[in-house]
Design a protein with these regions (language model features):
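Proteins enriched for Cys/Gly/acidic motifs involved in redox and nucleic-acid/cofactor modification
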Residues: 1-206, 244, 259, 281-292, ...
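A structural micro-motif
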Residues: 5, 33, 77, 101, ...
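Generic beta-strand/beta-sheet core signal
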Residues: 10, 199-201, 234-236, 262-264, ...
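Short, solvent-exposed amphipathic alpha-helical segments in soluble enzyme
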Residues: 25-27, 120, 248-251, 275-278, ...
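Conserved SAM/AdoMet-binding glycine-rich loop
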Residues: 79-80, 88, 93, 190-313, ...
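Conserved, mostly hydrophobic/aromatic
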Residues: 161, 181, 198, 233, ...
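Terminal RNA-binding accessory module
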Residues: 345-439
């Protein structure tokens, strides 16, 4: 198709959202659209939003208004809001944000070409398709760089955590077929991707809806036969991490010894209120087993402070757990009440300020742990995937112990270029970042 129109894509939120953005880019590319990062030159801007917590909603609205400000120098700019905010608040967006031309929910990503065509023609479409529709296979325009990419293996979630709106925005859990996943992985490997990051709301449930059993281990065995250097696992729920999966992670060199296991809390009362399966003791036992069975393992987790019912005793138990478990990477978030969730109706809610204070205290504990962990690398050699260069030309990258955007970096002297995998000797630590020299 001949098309002279130019589109800008702004992707907010989680890696799963970024994959949706990349799928939309590929559909637009096939339709002949060109892309730009310059909003002053774009005909249309798509803002793919998150609405998981209050801060994500605020970020999305601010980005919409910021994008609209470019109309002063680019009056023709059309704005499309897609993703979770659009799915959840389409009517409110239409009523309160006249800056928005098109609205496209999480069930309508495949309609992006027709939505862009409509807004460029002067229409104001609102599309919200079925959020639990079967997954469709579509190419992606990978935007993460020359050497790494996300691979989404499922969509939606069946876990029904009491604080979470994801099932109402993304639908029930739906696994992709193994054939579909492997075909995409082969294309990524052939394009030069060295690190494959496996994502879904809960990758440990992979296959249970399609094959009647969890199949993550089987899938990993097949993925590791392909030409990747690293395979990274994100969002494993604790209760489905079994011995077979642990053995595969421990024995397969391509699977990095870094696991992202969101636990949210350690106190049994709070876990029950969260509608999380398992107990604090089971979490402790799992982490102990993982460290025993997988030498050198680095753990990442997510925690929530201030859920209704969390008093000082429950919070202190969480702090004590952080000190004892010495989890190397963690994100701590103050509880955000979300309408339509069971937790939003619970009594005994602490104030927003108190939830924030507790999150900050947890992060102070975590900062000490992370600083101590960084010091252990001094004098060691690490494989580093080169991501870019500092303004002065110094290369930087990530080790297997660092996931993109959320963890640390390795900055080193040498002549490596983005996309390279090099060996670096670590000489020092600067504000949590490792400093070294290419060998």
């Amino acid at each position: 198709m001949n098309n002279s129109s130019t589109v800008a894509m702004i992707s907010l939120g989680c890696p799963k959202n970024l994959v949706n953005s990349e799928e939309m880019l590929a559909l637009l590319q096939d339709a002949g659209y060109a892309f730009t990062d310059d909003l002053a030159k774009a005909d249309a801007a798509i803002i793919n939003t998150c609405a998981f917590i209050e801060s994500a909603k605020t970020e999305a609205i601010e980005k919409i208004l910021e994008t609209a400000s470019y109309r002063e120098e680019n009056p023709k700019l059309k704005i499309i809001v897609s993703g979770c905010l659009a799915q959840r608040y389409a009517d409110d967006i239409r009523a309160e944000l006249p800056e928005v031309d098109g609205i496209m929910g999480t069930g309508s990503y495949s309609e992006v070409v027709s939505v862009v065509e409509a807004v460029l023609a002067g229409d104001k479409p609102t599309r919200r398709g079925a959020i639990s529709a079967p997954l469709y296979d579509t190419p992606r325009a990978v935007s993460t760089g020359p050497n790494w990419a996300y691979l989404r293996i499922a969509e939606g979630c069946d876990n029904r955590c009491a604080y979470c709106v994801i099932p109402s925005l993304r639908g029930k859990f739906r696994s992709r077929t193994k054939e579909s996943i492997l075909e995409e992985a082969r294309l990524l490997a052939a394009s030069g991707v060295k690190e494959l990051i496996i994502v879904a709301q809960d990758i440990t449930r992979y296959g249970i809806d399609l094959y009647g059993k969890v199949c993550l281990t089987e899938l990993l065995k097949e993925l590791c036969k392909l030409d990747f250097c690293w395979v990274r696992l994100h969002y494993l729920y604790p209760e489905l991490i079994d011995d077979e999966l642990i053995d595969e992670i421990a024995s397969e060199d391509k699977i990095v010894k870094y696991l992202d296991i969101p636990i949210q809390h350690i106190n049994d009362t709070i876990l029950r209120r969260m509608n999380r399966r398992g107990t604090g003791e089971e979490i402790r036992a799992l982490f102990k087993k993982l460290r025993e069975r997988i030498p050198g393992l680095v753990l990442r987790t997510s925690l929530i402070t201030g859920l209704p019912g969390e008093g000082e005793a429950e919070f202190e138990e969480l702090c004590d757990f952080l000190r004892e478990a010495k989890i190397e990477r963690a994100g701590v978030f103050p509880y955000s009440p979300e309408e339509g969730t069971p937790a939003a109706l619970m009594p005994d809610r602490c104030s927003t300020e108190e939830a924030q204070r507790r999150a900050e205290l947890c992060m102070e504990i975590q900062a000490e742990i992370m600083d101590g962990f960084a010091e252990t690398f001094i004098g060691r050699e690490l494989d580093v995937l080169v991501m870019g260069r500092e303004p002065d030309g110094t290369p930087w990258g990530r080790s297997e112990y660092d996931s993109p955007d959320i963890d640390s970096r390795v900055i080193f002297s040498g002549d490596a270029a983005p996309g390279d995998m090099v060996r670096v000797r670590i000489d020092s630590v600067d504000d949590g970042e490792l400093i070294g020299e290419q060998i």
